Amino acid sequence: MNNRTTIGILGSGTWGIALARLLHRNGHDVTVWSRSPKKIENLSATRTYPALPGLVIPETVHFTCDLQTVASGKDILLFAVPSIAIRQTAESARPFIPDGQIIVDVAKGIEPDTLMTMTEVIRDELSKDGQHDHVKLVALSGPTHAEEVALDMPTSIVSACTDMQVAETVQDVFMNTCMRTYTNTDVLGVELCGAMKNIEALAVGISSGLGNGDNARAALITRGIAEISRLGLKMGCAEYTFGGLAGIGDLIVTATSMHSRNNRCGILIGQGVPPQEAVRQVGTVEGINALPAAMQLMERYQVEMPIAKAVNAVVKGEISAKDMALALMTRDKTSEVRQSELAVRFESALMRHISGGIMRRVMVIGEFADLSHEAIAFLTRAKDEGGHLTVALTGCAQDVRKSSLLALRCVDRVLDLETEKLTLPELMRLYRIEVLVLAEGQDVPEMLPPTVKVKYL
């Protein structure tokens, strides 16, 4: 890719405009799209954005209402629309997006109906025509307020892609003296943090609205990242992501800044304003939008998330903000540090990733009635293909085999195909399987999701 990159930005909100200016400053050719002709006309004429005081949009940043103009022939296509508009935007832009396109998503959220992250939604929508199997998706996330980026205040962010070379390409495009960009291959972890931290930030805001101080704020932030981590490890994310910019970094800035709509909304709720009215006053509150998906994920993966659960109860009107604080403070006593089996099993994958490996979710299928030396060797080699290994167990009388498999350090999850209500392809989508490892002679399952790669050992 040349130093001067052509970039199309889908979305003309504060983040899209702030990034358009930053990318133009880096010497790139930038075109911004909005579905509103009136907004495009105003941006083109005034070269200002009311929500970003002091920002002047360069004359050579182009504006358009035409999807073909913004999407065709671009080196990078950036999705900067709200999370609820990602699927519709991807569907509309699909005819103009070539296969192999680098797509960067900056929206944060989980789609409630499918429990997909934003890059997964984009891939799912683009793949429906069977002609977009090789798009390169990047999640760009971290502690980034558009208001500060627009004023060239120092900021750091994460470029996450399963292909490190693509992550580094995006890193180079965004990096400058005011924007330091890091890379990560744990895309799911980065996106999960971006969605879940909004809920935890709501809790911090509610606490502040109740008049609580810094002690409570610090406790909620710390325990908030702990419960996000518990969920992420169950989903196969890398543990270190939660202690990084996309995890604790983004949570801190969202939970403490008045730039944050989640924090401001929480403060209003804590002060007694009904949740619906608080949202009306503040605008889009992604933390409230993320609650239905968070509750489903918590139940599906059997993870304790007391803060998120309490926020959900307040938003639904089941308890008051004051009762939420009391309920959290009077929970049964527990230890701060619990040695999770998943954390132990993740250790080898973590070390490999730090040394340059790539984190992927891997699945094997079989009866594994006899855990012979050969079977264990096969499972170990399968785990080496990615880092997080799921065994899909076939046959009957699986309880003993399931326990034996989980006792192995190389196995992270065991699914009982006889009792699961979902089909194998549905389970692969649910658990975001990226690599299916087969032994010689095993047939490839029917209706394999297009995102799953097959590897024979």
Segments (PLM) and residue ranges:
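Short acidic low-complexity segments
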Residues: 59-74, 348-355
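Internal alpha-helical scaffold of NAD(P)-dependent oxidoreductase catalytic cores
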Residues: 85, 96, 121, 128-136, ...
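NAD(P)+-binding Rossmann beta1-loop-alpha1 motif at the extreme N-terminus of oxidoreductases
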Residues: 1-56, 62-65, 92
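NAD(P)-dependent Rossmann-like dehydrogenase/reductase catalytic/cofactor-binding core
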Residues: 204-208, 233-243, 247, 251-344
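Nucleotidyltransferase catalytic core that binds NTPs
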Residues: 344-457
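Rossmann-like NAD(P)(H) cofactor-binding subdomain of soluble oxidoreductases
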Residues: 64-152, 170
